Amino acid sequence: MANITAAEHPKLVLEMTAMERTTPAHYDEWNVRHQQLLDNDKYLNEQFINVFSDSAAAHNSIYRGKNLTNVYTVDEICQRISAGTFKDLYVGDYFDISITTDLGGAETVRCILAGFDVFWNNGDTAFTKHHAVIVPKDCFKTKSVMNDTNVTTGGYVGSKMYKTVLPVYAAALQTALNNHILSHRELLTTAVSTTGNSNAGAGITGYASNWEWKDCLVKLMSEIQVYGSTVLSSSFYDTGCDNIQFPLFRLAPNLKVAGLGHNGSRWWYWLLAVVSAAAFAFCHHGDGSHRDAAGDGGVRPYFCIG
């Protein structure tokens, strides 16, 4: 059987001669139409490739939201990321994993692709591994405090969340993701002045007053990463490297809202910004607010894979 091959340089043809009852039912009549469809398909595919290149910038601009769980393995997804092409991966695409921790037992985590190469070349040591930022669709199922008492002493790095809670989830996620979580360097708050005025607003006292470069595996999000701007962050020390909004929340702002546990009812979750001497920032039902550090909030961090 002979094959029909698309033209080397096809043109888009938007008109086709209709077959009628009197048209001879000869293979030539069918072949010419098949040829036109084949040429059009090749032309449109070439135009798509020309416009949407396989690069971080292009893929950060397209929201798709496809379930990749049964399409690619974690290793296959990370191969596409580490190659820097991000082929067939777009913002909003997701896959499910299962983790087990001493904090919450067994649970499902839906990992959403939130952006590509967002931290490329950042850090006191340049981060030059191609990566995808992952944000869980929902909080982990167990609530947590930032600190056992209503203080922000030591900033984010001094918190119970940073020192005790997140390392437990980091270990479980690293196991579930076949060690594909990438460490990168970020500026994190390490001190709080309890007497000065906070940028959060009139009458709010206490602000982040220092920072240090730290290795990061799993980390709470900043206000800018979620909202695109600061809302209640106490000072510029709260921003550091977290100074752009994740493409996920730019393209699908409804995903700021999360549930408690996989597909659970909506719940507020902690952000990393110090707000005052007693409170940290959090994301409520899409709005920015703050809560005393000993409040029980959701844990919805991000991490990079590749």
Residue ranges and their predicted role:
Residues 53-306:
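Collagenous Gly-X-Y triple-helix signature in extracellular proteins
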Residues 1-49:
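Extracellular "spike/adhesin" assembly and maturation modules
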